[in-house]
């Protein structure tokens, strides 16, 4: 029998609420475990419960305490481990407890800030008030100047969301799924229109804050601002693989949000099967590579000048899992290649598979002084195997037959993986058994 959330030991609360927060991708982890930190123990370890890594608006990587205020929730979203009907142990922090935990972790140099989200209790406004109270105490009572990322609730009043933005460095609202049809099926309490309206309100406050700061810079003897006037950006998360939405629909929604509300980032989170799942959910998670391809396509939309329709034509609404999106586009549009790297404009160089924005900048700078060769590209650490079929250099021109060959796609496909025998998984096996298996005797 579970004990009351209010009477629970603080350490146990942290275990439960840090674990419950891991499903939110809006606070991105580096994705890699540091050497000797995998067990979360030892001096200097940042792999303990509730600690994740994210990036600040100025590009710094910071360690954050990532927790929920509570995992109790009024909503019954089918894909969520913390849904109302889920049989999980519930816990709840008070605002004072979260503020003190943040300070304790910060003083011990475990973290540089806080990522705080919450299940919905009583009402959206009540929950939002509790989340804001944590940030208020940190900023006004304890004079905390570390990084704060607050997960806001679209159903909360705009006044409360505005108040959250005055305390936080970044705020985010999860859109969850790309269409209202999917929300009606899997998260009936959520409304896409409400979410977008809240995002537009945040964008307006960010614009007003930037304008005020610009005006303040023109005043010589202005008082120093010790905390952000308003959050410097917002982000969101979409769950991938919980419904039948195509990659085209997901990316069209992301592209719309980038353009309309100027999101800093859309996070794509592959659906993870949960205990006691709804019959409306898939049995298996989507391939992990699908999430990776969506991030690659997202990058092309934001920084390389691609449109969703170019990456995903109507006849093929899902990304190729075997090839990265830029390479897949190039193979569908071979008529625009080869591209002369010594003459092509920047926008065309960005579209060459294997060339990123950094290498394109180097090429543009270097070709002012001499015609570039493959050796020059190699010195720039360009992947020659990937770019050669698509470029013309001073000493290289690809064979048209190769560029037009149906076999070119095969050239870029990953090779077959060697299966490994894991003898550690067979405790009964002896060294002699292993030797016989390797020699083909069994």
Predicted feature residues:
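Conserved, mostly hydrophobic/aromatic
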Residues: 64, 77, 116, 173, ...
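Conserved AdoMet/S-adenosylmethionine-binding subsite of the radical SAM
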Residues: 99, 122-311
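Flexible, acidic/Gly-rich N-terminal and inter-domain linker regions that tether
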Residues: 1-72, 383-384, 389-392, 396-442
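Short Fe-S-cluster ligation motifs
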Residues: 101-117, 297
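Short, charged beta->alpha transition segments
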Residues: 65-68, 96-107
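Long, highly charged, low-complexity intrinsically disordered interaction regions
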Residues: 279-350, 386-433, 437, 441-442
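Helix-hairpin-helix
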Residues: 339-366, 370-389
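Canonical Radical SAM [4Fe-4S] cluster-binding loop centered on the CxxxCxxC motif
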Residues: 67-96
